[in-house]
Design a protein with these regions (language model features):
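Conserved catalytic core of the tyrosine transesterase superfamily
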Residues: 1-210
């Protein structure tokens, strides 16, 4: 056999072996409520953040979906909130619940800058009023969690989505419906929340008397 003059081992791409994903970071629902209560709603930034986080917590939307919500996605007459799924592209119509409608209306009337040129709902309050980014949402979540006395160091922008999904499964919601609402294409994507729910059940289980 012939030998190479140069070592080409660095050019060989090692195969990647897929491992099971770890459980998503979730918070108890009472902690989610504490974060929402901690948002000060006497200023425009608080009106925006409260409406944004309430939408995420109530519907389990991801930050990538929330930052793309537009004014036309809110059908006030039909009481529908339309969401464009980022992963699947499938449109989703959600009921515009009274609490959501009230929070959005308060923000749009007294919080969102009137001179904003675009149609994006959640925008920066500083000029030039660009749409919020997912990293900005993560920052806002951590700030309000810290205000609520909740450790925020590892909280990501999807913690509300993960907590919503786990809460639905804890409440006995059908597995398929939870996956559809979250926009999952594969059942395995939803199964991670089942593992979280089972882990919580084990932690809450009473010891068997001997």
């Amino acid at each position: 056999t012939r030998r190479l003059r140069h070592d080409l081992s660095d050019c060989v791409v090692a195969p990647r072996y897929r491992t099971d994903e770890g459980p998503p970071r979730c918070l108890p629902w009472e902690d989610i409520r504490r974060i929402l209560r901690a948002v000060p709603r006497d200023r425009p930034v608080g009106l925006r953040d409260y409406a944004m986080l309430l939408v995420m917590a109530t519907y389990g939307l991801g930050s990538g979906e929330v930052v793309h919500l537009e004014l036309g996605d809110v059908d006030w007459r039909a009481r529908i909130l339309r969401v464009r799924r980022r992963k699947t592209g499938v449109p989703l119509e959600l009921p515009l619940l009274p609490a959501i409608a009230q929070a959005l209306a308060a923000y749009l009337r007294r919080g969102r800058p009137s001179q904003t040129l675009g149609h994006t709902i959640f925008v920066s309050l500083a000029l030039p009023h660009r749409p919020l980014t997912t990293s900005a949402i993560r920052h806002r979540i951590r700030e309000h969690a810290h205000r609520a006395g909740i450790s925020a160091a590892k909280l990501g922008a999807h913690v509300f989505r993960h907590s919503h999904a786990t809460r639905q499964i804890d409440a006995g919601a059908p597995f398929k419906i939870v996956g559809d609402i979250l926009g999952h294409l594969r059942p395995a994507s939803t199964s991670v929340y089942v593992r979280v729910a089972l882990r919580r059940l084990r932690m809450a289980a009473l010891p068997v008397p001997r």
